[in-house]
Curated annotation (Swiss-Prot):
Quaternary structure (record): Homodimer.
Designated name of the protein: Aspartate--tRNA(Asp/Asn) ligase
Lineage: Bacteria, Pseudomonadati, Pseudomonadota, Alphaproteobacteria, Rickettsiales
Residues marked Important for tRNA non-discrimination (site): H33
Gene3D superfamilies: Bira Bifunctional Protein, Domain 2, GAD-like domain, Nucleic acid-binding proteins
EC class: ligase
Binding-site positions, ATP: R223, D224, E225, E485, G537, V538, D539, R540
Gene giving rise to this polypeptide: aspS
Source organism of the structure: Anaplasma phagocytophilum (strain HZ)
GO terms classed as biological process: aspartyl-tRNA aminoacylation
Described function: Aspartyl-tRNA synthetase with relaxed tRNA specificity since it is able to aspartylate not only its cognate tRNA(Asp) but also tRNA(Asn). Reaction proceeds in two steps: L-aspartate is first activated by ATP to form Asp-AMP and then transferred to the acceptor end of tRNA(Asp/Asn).
Cellular component aspect of the GO annotation: cytoplasm
Alphabetized PROSITE patterns for the sequence: AA_TRNA_LIGASE_II (PS50862)
């Protein structure tokens, strides 16, 4: 028999009345009713009410009264039925209580810095410093149990489809592509460093070259990048997947049902879109102003550049003639809104970098108003209504700028309008694939990879040799859910000549590619199958399912937005002897010192 417990704290019911039991757990609540003391004893599984009567054992009663909340105790007692008026139907044990005759304190708790039942109401820094208390809160614990269940379902889904689970190395070589690496100095090889992997990219491609047909892992990834609400600094986990002899559609046909089934299982009363529509990157930027569209928002942006090119509204007409664009953002049922509504949108647009924000209102009595309307003919107004999908009672806002900037600005205005007008569909998960990403982009006047340098360009070597680099699209794809990117993937470039050509266009010689990615280029010389993969983010998926405001709420021991572990005190200084052993010396710049001190 276990000396600490005969039952768990969720197990007792009326069938146990009269039994002698042993329970262990934390003191969750105490209620002192004069000569009777009630204690809610909590373990991982549930809560059982304990009762102590001063008239039965005054010494035990006084001792129990003195013990602090969250102390760990072991009790022995007799199960008794509660009186009818004290039954608690919200507890599985709510029909019984345990009359305690023995109580041992296993570990006494100090005065609590946070109130466990409502720990999520405390400042985040305090919660993270005392995360071991925060994790005892039911709401926080339920997020972690959801995380465990989601990962378990991911494993089952992949194994049922014939994928094998692999663990790739944590200590590897630094890569020049992507985010900043976390470096680990080598003691044995002075002056050299390992890197923590940003993703298992190279290793999973090498597994395909090794003949492992279908692979997955719940992969830890490490990137030295700033935090966002949907991104934790330091590390994150992804369901990393790779397959041999597949096309883009093959990857979609595997991953789409996996994600749909997982979301359906854990969505509760929320709906899940039955299909994942395909939206090209180009269309996403035009229609939604972002490559991460929230399809719960029904507003669709339209291009109305041609209308204004032929109009008398010189500000827009001359801009379009110089190569700028005009985007229209509908605002349904707002034509009768006060002037302050429109002025606030203009001010918002200016704050995010727009030179201004034009608008037209189409009243239900067919009156057309707004600072732009008087410059347009009836035909032009009708064309705008058709292109923007607006009618009587609606309004439409206009952004004019270079195409990329106009997309960014109109996307932000679309998001604001969707929220303020309460247009965002509630209690649903809306997915889409974003496809046909540009292969290249210009950064600081130089050609660079826009997404994944190891993806296959559509059109292969011919496209790289004969097309405008900015017109080349790749077999790259994202999955977006409710405006959050939850996965990226690609069909990989498995042909060495195409790889060398692609890298040469961004300034790498074949020798430089071999030096940086030698393991991969060596493998490409010995027979590599066509292959592709995808990597849904575990943390973001759980964050969406848990419906929490930031990703730290679903990570057991997260870093702060400044990349600090307040519980463990990391990052921390190390002593000089350790640095000497690693052949390292510190040279902290004034700029870095300022960041540290702040």
């Amino acid at each position: 028999m276990n000396m600490y417990r005969t039952h768990l704290c969720n197990a007792l019911n009326l069938s146990h009345v009269g039994e002698e039991v042993t329970l262990s757990g934390w003191i969750f609540r105490k209620r002192d009713h004069g000569g009777i003391l009630f204690i809610d004893l909590r373990d991982f599984y549930g809560i059982t009410q304990l009762v102590l009567n001063e008239s039965s054992d005054q010494e035990l009663f006084n001792y129990a009264r003195s013990i602090g909340l969250e102390s760990v105790i072991t009790v022995k007692g007799t199960v008794a039925a509660r009186s009818e008026d004290t039954i608690n139907t919200s507890l599985s044990t709510g029909h019984v209580e345990v009359a305690v005759h023995t109580l041992v304190t296993e570990s006494a708790a100090d005065a609590l810095p946070i109130h466990v039942p409502t720990s999520t109401n405390h400042p985040e820094d305090l919660r993270l410093k005392y995360r071991f208390l925060d994790l005892r809160c039911d709401k926080v614990k339920s997020n972690m149990l959801l995380r465990s269940a989601v990962i378990s379902e991911m494993r089952k889904a992949m194994e049922s489809r014939g994928f094998i689970e692999v663990q790739t190395p944590i200590l590897t070589a630094s890569s020049p592509e992507g985010a900043r690496d976390y470096l680990v100095p080598s003691r044995v090889h002075a002056g050299k460093f390992y890197a923590l992997p940003q993703a298992p990219q190279i290793f999973k491609q090498l597994l395909m070259a090794s003949g492992f047909d279908k692979y997955f892992q719940i992969a830890p990834c490490f990137r030295d990048e700033d935090a966002r609400a949907d991104r934790s600094p330091g590390e994150f986990y992804q369901l990393d997947v790779e397959m041999s002899f597949v096309t883009q559609e093959d990857v979609f046909s595997v991953m789409e049902p996996v994600l749909r089934d997982i979301f359906t299982k854990f969505a509760g009363n929320r709906s899940v879109s039955p299909t994942f529509p395909r939206i090209t990157y180009k269309d996403a930027m035009l229609r939604y102003g972002t490559d991460k569209p929230d399809l719960r928002n029904p507003i669709i942006i339209a291009d109305v550049s041609e209308v204004f090119l032929r109009s008398n509204f010189k500000t827009f007409q001359e801009g379009v003639a110089r190569g700028m664009v005009v985007r229209a953002i509908p605002a349904p049922k707002t034509s009768e809104h006060p002037r302050s509504f429109f002025d606030s949108k203009v001010e918002y647009a200016k704050k995010i970098g727009a030179r201004g924000l034009g608008y037209i209102t189409f009243s239900t009595d067919n009156t057309v108003k707004g600072p732009v309307a008087k410059f347009l003919s009836d035909t032009e107004l009708a064309n705008i209504q058709t292109l923007a999908g607006v009618g009587p009672g609606d309004s439409v806002f206009f952004v004019s700028d270079a195409a990329d900037k106009a997309a960014e600005l109109s996307g932000s205005v679309r998001e604001l309008l969707g929220t303020e007008l309460n247009l965002i569909e509630k209690d649903t998960f809306k997915f889409c694939w974003i496809v046909d990403f540009p292969y290249f982009q210009y950064e600081n006047g130089k050609l660079a990879f826009s997404h994944n340098p190891f993806s296959m360009p559509q059109g292969g070597l011919d496209a790289l040799s004969s097309s405008n680099p900015l017109d080349i699209v790749a077999y790259q794809y994202d999955i977006v859910c409710n405006g959050i990117e939850i996965s990226s993937g690609a069909i990989r470039n498995h042909k060495l000549d195409i790889l060398y050509k692609a890298f040469s266009m961004v300034g790498y010689s074949p020798e430089a590619v071999d030096a940086e990615f030698g393991a991969l280029t060596r493998a490409f010389r010995f027979g590599v199958p066509p292959h592709g993969g995808i990597a849904p983010g575990v943390d973001r998926i759980v964050m969406l399912l848990a419906d929490v405001p930031n990703i730290r709420e679903i990570i057991y021991f997260p870093l702060t937005q400044m990349g600090e572990d307040l519980l463990m005190g990391a990052p921390s200084e190390v002593n000089q002897s350790h640095l000497k052993e690693l052949s390292l010396a510190l040279n902290i710049t004034p700029k870095a010192a300022g960041k540290t001190s702040s």
